[in-house]
Amino acid sequence: MILNLIILLAISIVASASNIAAYWGQNAGGDQQTLGDYCSSSPASIIILSFLDGFPNLSLNFANQCSGTFSSGLAHCSQIGSDIKSCQQQGKTILLSLGGATGNYGFSSDSEAVQFAGTLWNKFGGGKDSERPFDDAIVDGFDFDIENKDQTGYAALATQLRKYFSTGTKSYYLSAAPQCPYPDESVGDLMSQVDLDFAFIQFYNNYCSLNQQFNWNSWSNYARGKSIKLYLGLPGSSSSAGSGFVGLSTVQRVVASIKGDSSFGGISIWDISSAENGGYLNQLYQALSGSGSPAAPSNSYQPNTPLTRTYGGSTATASAYISVGFTAGATHGSTTTNDLLAWIDSLFGSSQSSVQQYATPVQSVTATPQPVAATTTSAPKPTASAFNWFGWFDGTTTSTTLQTVYSTVPADQTVYVTLTTTVGSQMLQSLFDKRDVIAEAKSTNLQICWLLFIPLLALICS
């Protein structure tokens, strides 16, 4: 009865579209824990042991796990075997992955591959052998992570494994881990000739990653009419892949766009030790289950703490006020402090300006799923350096309009800011050169025509 419940649980897990499949064994995160630890603490429902990186002459590699050997030199991993059984009792599906990016593996012919199927079944499956690396633990299937572009024998191997599976007393699975370019150069024949259960597609280290030329449709078309489940393969951190790591907001956007695909099975991760760091794995699970949506951003922001920067002995201070509105279909614009009264005040201004006409805080409006009313925030008063006639003397009043700011809050929005600064005569750089925006300052320049205005002013005053 208990065995039947476990089998039913395993079947329901692999049929779900909210699965996390995680590779374990290569310590990509640098502090790999035991298999049992991850089964108990992580939301992963499928864990793939990596790797059986040598065959037909067997060689296992689990990085900092498993140091025992049989007399033949084959790895003897009793702890992993014990953990496999514990994981399976918790409803986890455990696969053994063949291949990897490095290793010494491959077949010279289909017949050699068919013969090797018996070795896999007897040493890791439901068969019998005097040297079983995981003792009496039986894996739930095999994964083909072939990356050497030699496709000889793998379709024959998988076909023969299916025959062995049919004699077993539980469900077994076959999977592949293709690179995202379709068709894959190493397992393309296998995937076209054999019915597989899962494809853990590596959408990283290639041009077809999520933030580039994402090609899910190519794989979805391949899966049409098949029972295979496609997994969105991601690196667990920026250090666990050469390229292709993306933030949670990108994953959420992509998952939302493909979750309705009947072939979508979930997310696969390389690898679990790196994805556990910082809680990324749990965030991915929440994104899949629908509970990981970011909180709606506030529609107004208080000004940043004034920033003070010094260049060439001159000091400048500025505060940025942001007002964001979310109104579908509207437009956006910006204004700066540059009216007539402000100009007149700058001619005879003291260190504190008394002008009451100031720029309206900039409002940016853009479409979002949940519109809210736009708000405004009072802008700070502009200041001007003392006795600043036409920019002839010590200071120059500069009005700076920032370019578009793309907010880091997890929503699709565009924010515009208006920034008013008072700068010294030697102030040449933007106050915000280290920020996530680019400011272009345009200072008031002395025009030669003003020289004609001085005699006229003297005549009027006399």
Curated annotation (Swiss-Prot):
GH18 domain: which residues?
18-291
Which family is this protein grouped under?
A: Belongs to the glycosyl hydrolase 18 family. Chitinase class III subfamily.
Q: Which InterPro entries match?
A: Cts1-like, Glyco_hydro18_cat, Glyco_hydro_18_chit_AS, Glycoside_hydrolase_SF, Glycosyl_Hydrlase18_Chitinase
> Keyword annotations for this protein?
Carbohydrate metabolism, Chitin degradation, Chitin-binding, Glycoprotein, Glycosidase, Hydrolase, Polysaccharide degradation, Secreted, Signal
Q: Where in the cell is it found?
A: Secreted
Which SUPFAM superfamilies does this UniProt record tie to the protein?
(Trans)glycosidases
Task: Report the protein name in the record.
Answer: Chitinase 1
Q: Where is the active site?
A: 147 (proton donor)
Record-level Gene Ontology MF annotations: chitin binding; endochitinase activity
Instruction: Give the signal peptide as a residue range, or say none if absent.
Output: 1-17
Q: Which residues are glycosylated?
A: 57
The reaction(s) catalysed by this protein are: Random endo-hydrolysis of N-acetyl-beta-D-glucosaminide (1->4)-beta-linkages in chitin and chitodextrins
- List the Pfam families hit by this protein, alphabetically: Glyco_hydro_18 (PF00704)
Report the EC number(s), separated by commas if there are several.
3.2.1.14
Q: One Gene Ontology cellular component annotation?
A: fungal-type cell wall
Gene symbol here is CHT1
Q: Name one GO biological process term.
A: chitin catabolic process
